Amino acid sequence: MREKITVARAGADAVDDLRPLFLALHRHHRSLVELPLVADDEAWRARKATYLEWFDEGRALLFVASAQDTPVGYALVVWHEGADDTFPLAPRYAELYTLSVAEEVRGAGVGGRLLDAVDDALADEGDPALVIAVMAGNADALRFYARRGVVPGEVLLYRFPRRAGADARPA
């Protein structure tokens, strides 16, 4: 894809257009981990509802990268209020909840431009802390964020309920 790519701030009205990019990211996550993930349609319904709720609450910040009016990437940030009890995040901090870039433009700087837009918006808000979660096994994402000065702070572990007749504990 060689078209000019633009990055612009968007609102709740753009959320429906994010479905293909979210599902591509969700499927990518499925390829990284051997853990149960929510089915695609259910995952999108839940994610869309979450995004729209955050917009309704005035807590969402969305940037969309587009080529010829077609979204090829997006970054969605959610604001959190209240101090963290472990890290000095201040009373208000941001979480990059989703960064997704279409496979056909990966490596072309789209993710960097989206994160630049996020960083500029955060600078306008007094440069609050930014928290980012990365799916286990996503070494490319870890390298990308490390180049941007983001460092690991904690590891999130899951234990899923045992299914009938199955033992979830390792042997």
Whereabouts are the PLM-identified features?
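Conserved acetyl-CoA binding element of GNAT-fold acetyltransferases
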Residues: 87-103, 158
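Conserved GNAT-fold acetyl-CoA-binding loop/helix
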Residues: 27-50
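Conserved beta-strand in the GNAT
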Residues: 64, 70-79, 95, 100
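A short helix-loop-beta-strand connector motif used in the catalytic cores of GNAT acetyltransferases and
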Residues: 49-64, 95
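Conserved beta-strand-loop-alpha-helix junction that forms the acyl-donor binding cleft
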Residues: 103-106, 118, 131-141, 158-163
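Conserved acetyl-CoA-binding loop-helix of GNAT-fold acetyltransferases
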Residues: 98-101, 107-120, 147
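Conserved acetyl-CoA-binding loop of GNAT-fold acetyltransferases
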Residues: 145-155
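Conserved N-terminal entry element of GNAT/NAT acetyltransferase domains
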Residues: 1-16, 24, 165-171
